[in-house]
């Protein structure tokens, strides 16, 4: 595990401990469970939105709303989650990914609520999930999907977090980087498999990472390639390899109009 990932996980543990003091788990769980059928807050179907785009012959883009990153600093000074979400929806995104980590990515729970409230797209809570508390938290904030990072979790906890999310009606995107992590990910139930092209130890990016892992991924998995999609040629390279789902953040966040950049990249 990289030093930066260890630091992030230590901060997450402290955040969860503090959150539990502000609100107990039974109360949070009760609210999360009550939202299964509440108008406007019920899960929107993250996996279904991706598959519908692909079935229609389009790239399924998970468009990210991210103000900053540990490696690149602030990506977008004029940061209005509602406007960004609306722009993405208008220009063909399938889903949203919203950073909620405050310490390292300058994200916030409120950004998720505001972005999801501004458009009809399903939303992923993009964060480092290490505790059941965060899963219930995600649902009360309106998340339709959570991210599980294999490099950050042992299998027992990962399976527990997945089961909780599925029970609440959310989808789960499990993220891997290498062969060893892929083996663990394939033991989960979720069909959504994200391949991060960024090495979490060196922060170097290579699209070859997705292509190298593809032969080892069962056909029933929906592969999402993450990081490093910067040009139409990158999109073509992936789609030629039968990868049709993409999670893109930085390229959009640095553009004057994120949705227009989405349309340019995937048009």
UniProtKB/Swiss-Prot annotation:
**Reaction equations catalysed:** 1-(2-carboxyphenylamino)-1-deoxy-D-ribulose 5-phosphate + H(+) = (1S,2R)-1-C-(indol-3-yl)glycerol 3-phosphate + CO2 + H2O
Q: Which UniProt keywords apply?
A: Amino-acid biosynthesis, Aromatic amino acid biosynthesis, Decarboxylase, Lyase, Tryptophan biosynthesis
Q: In which pathway does it act?
A: Amino-acid biosynthesis; L-tryptophan biosynthesis; L-tryptophan from chorismate: step 4/5
Q: Cross-referenced InterPro entries, in alphabetical order?
A: Aldolase_TIM, Indole-3-glycerol_P_synth, Indole-3-glycerol_P_synth_dom, Indole-3-GlycerolPSynthase_CS, RibuloseP-bd_barrel
Give one Pfam hit by family name: IGPS
Question: Source organism's superkingdom?
Answer: Bacteria
Question: What EC numbers are recorded for this enzyme?
Answer: 4.1.1.48
Q: Name one GO molecular function term.
A: indole-3-glycerol-phosphate synthase activity
> What does the record list as GO biological process?
L-tryptophan biosynthetic process
Q: Which CDD domains match?
A: IGPS
Instruction: List the coiled-coil residues.
Output: none
Gene3D superfamilies the record matches: Aldolase class I
Q: Which NCBIfam families match?
A: PRK00278.1-2, PRK00278.1-6, PRK00278.2-4
Q: Which family does it belong to?
A: Belongs to the TrpC family.
This chain belongs to the protein called: Indole-3-glycerol phosphate synthase
Instruction: Name its species.
Output: Cupriavidus taiwanensis (strain DSM 17343 / BCRC 17206 / CCUG 44338 / CIP 107171 / LMG 19424 / R1)
Q: Which gene encodes it?
A: trpC
